[in-house]
Design a protein with these regions (language model features):
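Helix-loop boundary and gating motifs at the non-cytosolic
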Residues: 12-72, 257-266, 334-339, 343-357
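Intracellular loop-helix junctions on the cytosolic face of multi-pass helical membrane proteins
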Residues: 2-24, 116-131, 158-339, 456, ...
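Loop-to-transmembrane helix entry/capping segments in MFS-fold secondary transporters
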Residues: 59, 158-167, 365-366, 654-664
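C-terminal ends and interior cores of transmembrane alpha-helices
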Residues: 101-124, 406-423
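A late C-terminal transmembrane helix in Major Facilitator Superfamily
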Residues: 657-684
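C-terminal transmembrane helical hairpin of 12-TM major facilitator-type secondary transporters
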Residues: 400-425, 430, 618-643
């Protein structure tokens, strides 16, 4: 084999040596660099979404924010530049990896600061400034990831890679906790909240996160540059500048074609009526391949025109790929790429839908946060350390096999979680003297069709259901609705399902909803379209496009009320008419375990045909099953992830570390994430139990693929 190839070996170290490997200086370096890598991602996604939400802005309103994610998805596109381009002064002073790492970290601090000094509530200009900061943060954070991955691979031999991957992952998770939960706690401590937006709180929170990045900068400055034998290249400065220009135009072609290709895909889907998940996946794959082809064509044309040194362009973009196929041969290289693209498919596809799944099982945000963010993170780290430990004692391919078995088999535990609740009886919807029966699915969703003529004869539906094994648990819920008339009307929907607020519910904000009919939103006062009143206190409610209004009231305020009665008031513009509706409620110590949530019914017209009434039976599922499922799933994912990172690292050539690993890591998540985008559609069609069974079965071919790759690699190493 060429000397630049990393060979996977079978370790025979003792357990003591395996444990002490985690205290190696290189492992500690990766812990701190992992922390630095874990800070930015949540500042772009979840924490930013909460900030924008408190400022009264939907993140989706600015499509520019979606570009921030492109940096992570397509980092392999500019990874060759990171491998090839020297940084004036810094490369000679710090070395190739540390120079780029320092630049990336400084850009991250700058990007976070740009976001901190942007108040989205002040208007579009400030919102675009924040979007620019988010995009810069996405690309600079992805650049940091490229360099850290290359640094890790060059820092130690293959046998040590699982240890480095484990400590890197531990640092990454800690960084995510600081930027996620830590940022939210700090913002809340500084006083901001939903309905009480304070810009300075978010400003100082983001500046604090920028300050935390100094840990990464200090680490970069005090560690040593990896010693790697590389072929010295001597090109003119102008050659490098021209290379950057060609790269810029190629990337611009890729990004533009990928973004605008979405419009073409939408037109094709609409015109041909494509709804099949696999057909949609094929379209998305063609969109990605087409964008890559356009970038490649644009780059090739510029190279042929002499816009850049041809030899330099070949060494930058073609050599890394050619090297991989040259070292492993076409057959083995293609099989390796197949394994890389599909190894994590089972757990990534199930992971995409996980938060929605937990919510569908009626677990609270607090329960989900505790289970996922605390126990999930802890056992993911334990799984990573276990993977690193076993890698010192096992052949990496055997460990990959164990990881693949666990990653897919643990999805079966989620079927147990779905089955942990009581079986439900029929849902009976009664309108006047007419009854309609529905069978709820495994998470309680149900729907019935009721003729509008029947609904027009009443103003309320009655819904009752029970546990299939205990009819004494029957629950009866009423929901009022409006009949469409020419005159304006307003009414309040039940506060909770039955106007009863439990002591547990009173600990959080309660959303009060109601409906308007006979008027449009434009006819209401702009600043306060609907006001909710309770004991003289006023709370502003927002009105959506369906004329359903909603406003949040603190549960403690509802609990302390003397009247226990909410009034909704709508003031019409240029009109003295005021619409009012009242709704009393009661306090109870606790509520029944069985409940029914019914979606608001739009105002009824007698001649509109059948009306679809939807709802959800809310029952309790085992919290013990929830914690067990999350613990074993994250333990398996952590172990499989550590083994897989070590495997990917072993495939890279020292001459093209950054490029090859960036390609591998992007390929690792690209296919599963594209398929994962259709998880919701699949669940709707087949339900959760069959979905998790499907994700388990998907993992079986991967086991054969791991065995096949292991056999081919053994044969290859004998050559």
């Amino acid at each position: 084999l060429p000397k630049t190839t990393r060979v996977m070996t079978t370790s025979s170290q003792g357990w003591k040596a395996a444990f002490t490997a985690f205290l190696d200086r290189r492992a500690l370096i990766m812990l701190f660099l992992g922390f630095s890598a874990g800070i930015p991602i949540l500042l772009i996604f979840s924490s930013l979404s909460l900030w924008l939400g408190e400022a009264g802005i939907e993140k989706s309103a600015v499509t520019f924010f979606s570009w921030a994610a492109l940096g992570y998805s397509f980092k392999f596109v500019w990874a060759p530049l990171i491998d090839e381009l020297p940084v004036p002064f810094l490369t000679k002073t710090l070395g190739r990896r540390r120079a780029w790492l320092l630049i990336a970290q400084i850009l991250i601090i700058g990007a976070i600061s740009i976001m901190a000094f942007s108040d989205p509530s002040l208007g579009q200009a400030h919102l675009y400034q924040m979007a620019v900061g988010a995009v810069l943060l996405g690309f600079s954070a992805a650049t940091q990831d490229i360099v850290i991955d290359a640094y890790r691979i060059e820092l130690a031999e293959t046998q040590m890679q699982t240890i480095l991957a484990s400590t890197y992952n531990a640092g990454y998770r800690i960084g995510m906790i600081v930027a996620g939960a830590g940022a939210l706690f700090l913002a809340a401590y500084l006083g901001t909240a939903k309905g009480n937006y304070i810009y300075d709180a978010w400003k100082y929170t983001y500046l604090a996160m920028a300050g935390v990045m100094v840990i990464g900068v200090i680490t970069t400055l005090i560690v040593r540059e990896p010693q790697v034998d590389r072929v010295k290249k001597s090109y003119k400065k102008s050659d490098y500048y021209r290379l950057v220009i060609v790269f810029f135009f190629a990337v611009l072609g890729f990004v533009c074609s990928y973004i605008y290709g979405d419009n073409l895909v939408s037109i094709i889907k609409t015109s041909l009526g494509i709804k099949d998940s696999f057909a949609l996946f094929g379209l998305e794959a063609l969109r990605f391949i087409g964008s890559g082809a356009i970038a490649l064509l644009l780059g090739s044309v510029l190279v042929k025109m002499g816009a850049v040194n041809k030899q330099m362009a070949y060494e930058t973009w073609v050599n890394p790929i050619a090297d991989f196929f040259r070292r492993y041969g076409v057959k083995l290289a293609l099989v390796l790429l197949l394994l890389i693209g599909f190894y994590r498919i089972s757990d990534i596809i199930s992971g995409v839908i996980s938060n929605v799944f937990y919510q569908d099982l009626n677990f609270t945000k607090e329960q989900i946060a505790e289970a996922v963010k605390v126990y999930g993170v802890i056992f993911s780290l334990i799984g990573g350390f276990l993977g690193g430990l076993l890698a010192q004692r096992m052949n990496i391919m055997k460990l990959m096999f164990v990881g693949a078995v666990l990653a897919s088999a643990t999805n079966l535990v989620f079927i147990g979680l779905v089955k942990s609740g009581h079986s439900l009886g029929d849902v009976v919807v009664q309108v006047g003297s007419e009854q309609y029966v529905a069978q709820p699915d495994e998470v309680g969703q149900w729907t019935v069709q009721v003729p509008s003529q029947v609904l027009a004869q009443d103003h309320q539906i009655n819904v009752h259901t029970y546990y299939a094994d205990d009819k004494s648990t029957q629950r009866d819920i009423q929901l009022p609705y409006l009949i469409e008339q020419n005159q304006p009307q307003i009414h309040l929907l039940p506060i909770t399902s039955d106007d009863h607020i439990s002591a547990k519910e009173a600990k959080q904000s309660i959303v009060v909803k109601g409906q308007l009919t006979g008027i449009t939103v434009d006819q209401l006062e702009a600043d306060k379209p609907v006001i909710l009143k309770l004991d003289g206190q006023e709370f502003t409610a927002k009105v959506d496009s369906n004329n359903i209004f909603s406003g949040a009231i603190d549960g403690k305020v509802l609990q302390a009320s003397s009247t226990k009665k909410i009034t909704a008031i709508a003031q019409l513009k240029e009109n003295t008419q005021v619409l009012q509706a009242q709704r009393p409620y009661q306090l109870v110590s606790e509520k029944q375990s069985l409940d029914v949530d019914i979606q608001p019914i739009m105002p009824i017209k007698a001649d509109q045909g059948d009306v679809e009434i939807k709802g959800k039976v809310i029952k309790e599922y085992s919290s013990l099953w929830l914690y067990f499922a999350i613990v074993v799933d994250n333990l398996a994912a952590g172990l499989a992830g550590a083994a897989f990172i070590a495997f990917l690292s072993s495939l890279t050539s020292v001459s093209f570390t950054a490029v090859q690993y960036a390609i591998f890591s992007s390929l690792m998540t690209l296919t599963p994430k594209i398929l994962g985008g259709y998880s919701g559609t699949i669940v709707t069609k087949i339900g959760y139990p069959d979905f998790f069974l499907m994700t388990t079965l998907i993992g079986i071919p991967i086991l054969f693929l791991v065995v096949w790759v292991g056999k081919l690699l053994k044969e290859h190493q004998k050559l």
